[in-house]
């Protein structure tokens, strides 16, 4: 029986070519071609191992390696012809290799399946992405440390429920983001450990009958360990899900930070100014200067959250081992990594350029009875129970609201209406400086604690 020849590597079983629409629908080359560098890296390592175990001759290995390197140069020069009829990045590269070096190119796939090939490619790619993202987190943290050190004495209101709560230093506030990003860094480092396990050698699902030595390819590709089960190696994408979970947490932190920057740049706050290069204007309102970078980062967080949900949904119903569903793992993973990396880059560039408006911050901290807790603590030190002190200060605050006076603006006689325990030394704790300086412990907002935290932060970054 005569059968029309197809370009697919698996066409021998079939009696007719794939429908043209189905071929386009099932092809992944339009998005997985970004894996080309890691696909070639894996193939070179695989060919090197096959030569060491005698499956390929040294001459065949050299021809394959040279051909793959030339193909990489073609791709990077923009002259490579990506073909949808060849489905994916793997078969496009293999077909071009065979075009270049002949029948030897067909030997490259010996002892390997696209199932373990793509799992290896994704892990290699994600490992590199994590390393880039970690570097951007560090760069952003360095910027936060520099700004926090410069603003260690700058007083601003701290908020709960977006209402004035207690005075803090701007430097202390910035260091909160440093801490959160530090945990994001740790999560990604930990995630990388599980990404960096090699599935290559799992073949389709059960391993291979060839005398492969997986330790060789593991070492050549820089993996920490060989995967212990071939079914697991080709079928699970928990490492990608874990990355998206860590990326979602990082984007959540950036989104919250973005919200603060948007508020602080508004006319209602005016706490900070962003350089023009990080803002845009309005097509109709000439006066507008919009904080587009933080607004967009805030919005982009949803893309990463969506990638996490999408991957969880993708995997939840699949039996072992590989299923075509897994082709859908790449686009959300790629997008999550791109979004996090670019958001971090934008923030790492922008944060050191933030210009605080110190007097406006200070005036905002002065309003809203932000030293009320300090007055309560003062009365506790005079021997009164805290709950009684809380009520006393509450009455004083009500008086202040009615009279239009902050606590520090009241006379001693006015304050003594609420407790005879109040003496002239009370004004030492009612000042903004007195309030922040009193919180002089590790993790507190006192300026010297901010400087100490900056020093610890720099030491931490130096050890990475």
Curated annotation (Swiss-Prot):
<dbReference type="InterPro" id="IPR029419">
    <property type="entry name" value="Arg_succ_lyase_C"/>
</dbReference>
<dbReference type="GO" id="GO:0005829">
    <property type="term" value="C:cytosol"/>
</dbReference>
<dbReference type="GO" id="GO:0004056">
    <property type="term" value="F:argininosuccinate lyase activity"/>
</dbReference>
<keyword id="KW-0028">Amino-acid biosynthesis</keyword>
<dbReference type="GO" id="GO:0042450">
    <property type="term" value="P:arginine biosynthetic process via ornithine"/>
</dbReference>
<dbReference type="Pfam" id="PF00206">
    <property type="entry name" value="Lyase_1"/>
</dbReference>
<dbReference type="InterPro" id="IPR000362">
    <property type="entry name" value="Fumarate_lyase_fam"/>
</dbReference>
<dbReference type="GO" id="GO:0006526">
    <property type="term" value="P:L-arginine biosynthetic process"/>
</dbReference>
<keyword id="KW-0456">Lyase</keyword>
<dbReference type="InterPro" id="IPR008948">
    <property type="entry name" value="L-Aspartase-like"/>
</dbReference>
<dbReference type="InterPro" id="IPR020557">
    <property type="entry name" value="Fumarate_lyase_CS"/>
</dbReference>
<dbReference type="InterPro" id="IPR022761">
    <property type="entry name" value="Fumarate_lyase_N"/>
</dbReference>
<dbReference type="InterPro" id="IPR009049">
    <property type="entry name" value="Argininosuccinate_lyase"/>
</dbReference>
<comment type="pathway">
    <text>Amino-acid biosynthesis; L-arginine biosynthesis; L-arginine from L-ornithine and carbamoyl phosphate: step 3/3.</text>
</comment>
<dbReference type="InterPro" id="IPR024083">
    <property type="entry name" value="Fumarase/histidase_N"/>
</dbReference>
<dbReference type="Pfam" id="PF14698">
    <property type="entry name" value="ASL_C2"/>
</dbReference>
<comment type="similarity">
    <text>Belongs to the lyase 1 family. Argininosuccinate lyase subfamily.</text>
</comment>
<keyword id="KW-0963">Cytoplasm</keyword>
<keyword id="KW-0055">Arginine biosynthesis</keyword>
<protein>
    <recommendedName>
        <fullName>Argininosuccinate lyase</fullName>
        <ecNumber>4.3.2.1</ecNumber>
    </recommendedName>
</protein>
């Amino acid at each position: 029986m005569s059968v029309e020849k197809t370009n697919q590597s698996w066409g021998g079983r079939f009696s007719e070519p794939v429908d043209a629409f189905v071929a386009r629908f099932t092809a992944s080359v339009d998005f997985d071609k970004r894996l080309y560098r890691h696909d070639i890296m894996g193939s070179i390592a695989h060919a090197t191992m096959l030569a060491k175990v005698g499956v390929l001759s040294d001459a065949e290995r050299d021809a394959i390696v040279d051909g793959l390197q030339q193909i990489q140069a073609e791709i990077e020069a923009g002259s490579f012809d990506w073909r949808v009829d060849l489905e994916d990045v793997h078969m496009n590269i293999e077909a071009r290799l065979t075009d270049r070096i002949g029948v030897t190119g067909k030997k490259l796939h010996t002892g390997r399946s696209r199932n373990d090939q793509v799992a290896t490619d994704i892990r290699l790619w994600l490992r590199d992405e994590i390393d880039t993202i970690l570097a951007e987190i560090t760069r952003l943290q360095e910027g936060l440390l520099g700004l926090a050190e410069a603003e260690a004495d700058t007083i601003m209101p701290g908020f709960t429920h977006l209402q004035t709560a207690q005075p803090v230093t701007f430097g202390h506030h910035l260091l909160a983001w440093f801490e959160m990003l530090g945990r994001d860094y740790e999560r990604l480092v930990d995630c990388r450990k599980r990404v960096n396990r090699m599935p290559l050698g799992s073949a389709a699902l059960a391993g291979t009958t060839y005398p492969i030595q997986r330790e060789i390819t593991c070492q050549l590709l820089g993996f920490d360990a060989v995967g212990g089960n071939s079914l697991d190696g080709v079928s699970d994408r928990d490492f990608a899900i874990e990355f998206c979970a860590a990326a979602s947490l990082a984007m959540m932190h950036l989104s919250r930070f973005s919200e603060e920057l948007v508020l602080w740049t508004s006319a209602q706050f005016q706490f900070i100014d962003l350089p023009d290069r990080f803002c845009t204007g309005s097509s109709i309102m000439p006066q507008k200067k919009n904080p587009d970078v933080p607004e967009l980062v805030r919005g982009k967080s949803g893309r990463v959250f969506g990638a996490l949900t999408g991957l969880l949904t993708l995997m939840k119903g699949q039996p072992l081992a590989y299923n075509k569903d897994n082709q859908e793992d790449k686009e959300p993973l790629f997008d999550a990594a791109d979004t996090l990396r670019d958001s971090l880059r934008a923030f790492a560039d922008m944060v050191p350029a933030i210009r605080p408006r110190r007097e406006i911050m200070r005036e905002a901290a002065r309003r809203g009875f932000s030293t009320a807790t300090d007055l309560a603590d003062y009365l506790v030190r005079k021997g009164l129970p805290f709950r009684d002190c809380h009520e006393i200060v509450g009455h004083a605050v009500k008086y202040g609201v009615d009279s239009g006076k902050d606590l520090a603006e009241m006379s001693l006689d006015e304050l003594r209406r609420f407790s005879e325990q109040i003496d002239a030394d009370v004004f030492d704790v009612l000042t903004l400086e007195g309030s922040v300086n009193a919180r002089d412990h590790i993790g507190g907002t006192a300026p010297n604690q901010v400087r100490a935290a900056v020093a610890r932060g720099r030491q931490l970054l130096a050890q990475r």
